[in-house]
Swiss-Prot record:
Its EC number is 2.7.7.8. Residues 593-652 form the KH domain. It is an enzyme of class 2 (transferase). Mg(2+) binds at residues 527, 533. Keywords: Cytoplasm, Magnesium, Metal-binding, Nucleotidyltransferase, RNA-binding, Transferase. It comes from Mycolicibacterium gilvum (strain PYR-GCK) (Mycobacterium gilvum (strain PYR-GCK)). GO terms for cellular component: cytosol. Belongs to the polyribonucleotide nucleotidyltransferase family. GO terms for molecular function: 3'-5'-RNA exonuclease activity; magnesium ion binding; polyribonucleotide nucleotidyltransferase activity; RNA binding. The gene is pnp. This is Polyribonucleotide nucleotidyltransferase. Its cofactor is Mg(2+). It holds the Pfam family RNase_PH_C.
């Protein structure tokens, strides 16, 4: 991979992505022109019009009192990148959009484990979107830009990291697909990794995967496309590796030409070896026994007791090093948990490696909610709640992404009491936003279209108790809740979290073998102590969403394929339990709005709305219905009961699809305007007639219209004449005839106006 010095001190490297018949994409990395005071700054281009600036900086001094690595990733969306002014009140960018937050997480997950262990200097990576072609998504380019700026910064970093989006389109995995190409994809995933191995024997270690079936997958599969099964997903991961390698090569070449020498940064190990050996000698036996306790609360109580005893016993020997004792104790716990899994194939709570904890599912748990459910898996408990409303309540999105509105909104809440702790409550943290987005993507492929189900849907997942994969529990609870709300899902979806433990294990004869053990339905501790966190959601037939993070330098393809197959077995088991609670959509809640869809001619939309919304507002006030109109003439009418909705529909149809009144027809109309020469009476929505002043006195002369007719009065009238311009002349019906008319025998058009 060659590097070009395009001017003095400005270097550029390029990665070319060849998608065959789908075209070629070019990713360029440039450094030396912008943000020169940052430790490392790189401008990344996707083709010619999408441009990001990534700047990496480090604090001068370490935060010695921190017991974690203080890495911060920020993504700044500038609306000028798309030639737009922000829609906020102050017309400037404010808090990051959901897209920006999710991109921060995409960058953080593969970058964080790539820094050297024990680093305590604050590291900040800021990615700014400077220009964006509407056909492109910027998130994957941001991963590469962040890695490249960090790689040249002189900070100890075991990169570079390459990131690519691959989409399955017409049977081919296409890298860096455009928004238009994604419309034809059945599956798309973001894969990040780095090159490992010696020259000539190199491979790509996959570090992070974020994948989903598209919302058109069922339609495309029905049309002959291949379903995104576990085997297909595994093929996609392999297909991503050459693209990642090319991106890593381009970054490495740039760093070779323009990168700084790696600086010396102080490293703070969690503990010294002497502390670990002392802790191990004191605690191993008691801790090994405690880790066989099945219940989380009892197990935690016992391990905390042992920890307190160890700290007390070693406090004098290691005065002032209590943090090291705690870290060493955690490391010993991790070693014992992993050892038992690898050698005995037993886990902390006594389960085998493929066992799922006890499952339960229940629907209709909240009285007035439109739909609700409770899903439990062991000590993880999730409540799902569904709310239905008019389509106009869809979320409006003001960001750089192609999405401008969102009809299905999935919100995830993780209160501190779910883990028995205290903490801050309020606006969602990045983790909550990420978990909600994952559950949302898992369900999108099975949601009905707006034509099939004309509602905006808000799904809320409440993590009431947590001990392992609340995000996948949210998928299960949401499926149950949506069905309880009457949403006609195309198929039920369930999710499961998988784990992986690997290490060199001594075997008989004195040899050593590398052993991989995949765990089904991991606990929180197994997530923390394992080598992989792998969440997989789907129907009984295919995968709808997948998220993978690993700490290993590569997972053998057969191990990953086995984990996918193991996840499917668990998913089928969970779906069976869910089907016992509810297996088809329930009747809609009496508290949910009834929404009807009708079509009106596009050229009649203005008449239905009326000047300054006068007509549509009057229909809403008279009937109590809620009305929204789309640009294509689709009208959504929602009301708490069918009668109100039908009354509104009748009024809309009378305007948009009118039946012209005829001479001789009688109406009970409402006076809407008075003038010196008569009173205008509303007969049908949008159609008025005039009773001349000479006809208002019933044979008597009157001087002022308001003496006999005021705005709002009801008058029974008959059409006397319709001129060639459509203007209607009315006369009053004789009093004796009006009195003889009964509700059972209304005038011809009375039925359409009786709600006036």
């Amino acid at each position: 991979m060659s590097v070009v010095e395009i001017e003095e001190g400005v270097f550029e490297s390029t990665a070319t992505i060849d998608n065959g018949s789908f075209g070629t994409r070019t990713i360029r990395f440039e450094t030396g022109r912008l943000a020169r005071q940052a430790a490392g700054a790189v401008v990344a281009y996707l083709d010619d019009e999408t441009m990001l600036l990534s700047a990496t900086t480090a604090s001068k001094q370490p935060k010695e009192h921190f017991d974690f690595f203080p890495l911060t990733i920020d993504v700044e969306e500038r609306m000028y990148a798309a030639g737009r002014i922000p829609g906020s009140f102050f017309r400037r960018e404010g808090r990051p959009s959901t897209d920006a937050i999710l991109t921060c997480r995409l960058i953080d997950r593969p970058l964080r484990p790539t820094f050297i262990s024990g680093l305590r200097n604050e590291i900040q990576v800021v990615v700014t979107v400077l220009s964006l072609d509407p056909k492109d998504l910027y998130d994957v380019l941001a991963i590469n830009a962040a890695s490249a700026s960090t790689q040249i910064s002189g900070i100890p970093f075991n990169g570079p990291v390459g990131g690519v989006r691959v989409a399955l389109i017409d049977g081919q995995w296409v890298a860096f697909p455009t928004v238009e190409q994604l419309e034809k994809a059945v599956f798309d995933m973001v894969v990040a990794g780095r090159k490992v191995g010696d020259a000539g024997n190199e491979d790509v270690a996959i570090m992070m995967v974020e994948a989903e079936a598209t919302d058109k997958v069922i339609e495309l599969v029905a049309g002959g496309a291949g379903a995104p099964t576990e085997a297909v997903v595994a093929e996609g991961l392999e297909a991503a590796k050459p693209f990642i390698a090319a991106l890593c090569d381009a970054q490495a070449a740039l760093a070779g030409a323009a990168g700084k020498e790696t600086a010396e940064y102080p490293v703070f190990p969690d503990y010294a070896e002497d502390v670990y050996y002392s802790v191990a000698s004191v605690a191993t036996d008691a801790l090994s026994e405690a880790l066989t306790i099945a219940g989380k609360e009892a197990r935690d109580d016992r391990t905390n007791e042992i920890k307190a005893e160890v700290v007390e016993r070693l406090a004098e020997q290691y005065a002032g090093r209590e943090k090291e004792i705690g870290a060493a104790y955690r490391s010993l716990t991790k070693k014992l948990v992993r050892q038992r899994i690898l050698t005995d194939h037993f886990r902390i709570d006594g389960r085998g490696v493929t066992d799922i904890r006890a499952l339960s599912a229940e629907v209709a748990v909240i009285p007035r909610a439109h739909g609700s459910a409770l899903f439990e898996r062991g000590e993880t408990q999730i409540m799902g709640v569904t709310t239905l409303d008019m389509v106009k309540m869809a979320q409006q999105i003001d960001s750089l992404g192609p999405e401008t509105s969102k009809r299905y909104m999935h919100h995830y809440n993780f209160p501190p009491y779910s883990t028995g702790e205290t903490g801050r409550v309020g606006s969602p943290k990045r983790r909550e936003i990420g978990h909600g987005a994952l559950a949302e993507r898992a369900l999108m492929p099975v949601l009905p279209s707006v034509e099939e189900f004309p509602y905006a849907i808000r799904q809320v997942s409440e993590a009431l108790s947590s001990n392992g994969s609340t995000s996948m529990g949210s998928v299960c609870a949401s499926t149950l809740s949506l069905l309880n709300a009457g949403v006609p899902l195309k198929a039920p979806v369930a999710g499961i979290a998988m784990g992986l433990v690997s290490d060199d294990v001594e075997v008989e004869g004195g040899g050593v073998e590398r052993r991989f053990v995949t765990l089904t339905d991991i606990l929180g501790a197994e997530d923390a102590f394992g080598d992989m966190d792998f969440k997989c959601a789907g129907t009984k037939d295919f995968v709808t969403a997948l998220q993978l993070d690993t700490k290993l330098d590569g997972i053998p393809s057969q191990v990953l394929a086995g984990a996918l197959a193991q996840a499917k077995d668990a998913r089928i088991t969970i779906l069976e339990v869910m089907a016992e609670a509810i297996d088809e959509p329930d009747e809609m809640s009496p508290y949910a709005p009834r929404i009807t869809t009708i079509k009106v001619p596009v050229d009649k939309i203005g008449e239905v709305i009326g000047p300054k919304g006068k007509m549509i507002n009057s229909i809403t006030e008279e009937t109590g219905a809620s009305i929204s109109i789309e640009d294509d003439g689709t009208v959504f009418v929602g009301a708490s009961n069918g009668e109100a909705a039908q009354a509104a529909i009748d009024k809309i149809n009378a305007i948009a699809n009118p039946q012209l009144p005829k001479v001789g027809e009688r109406f009970l109309g409402t006076v809407v305007k008075t003038t010196d020469f008569g009173a205008f009476v509303s007969l049908l929505p949008g159609r008025d007639g005039l009773v001349h002043i000479s006809k208002l006195g019933r044979g008597k002369r009157i001087n002022k219209v308001e003496d006999v007719a005021k705005v709002g009065d009801k008058l029974r009238v008959e059409i006397a004449d319709i001129d060639n311009r459509g203007k209607i002349s009315l006369v009053l019906v004789a009093e004796e005839e009006a009195g003889a008319a009964t509700p059972e025998a209304p005038a011809p058009a009375d039925a359409a106006t009786s709600s006036s």
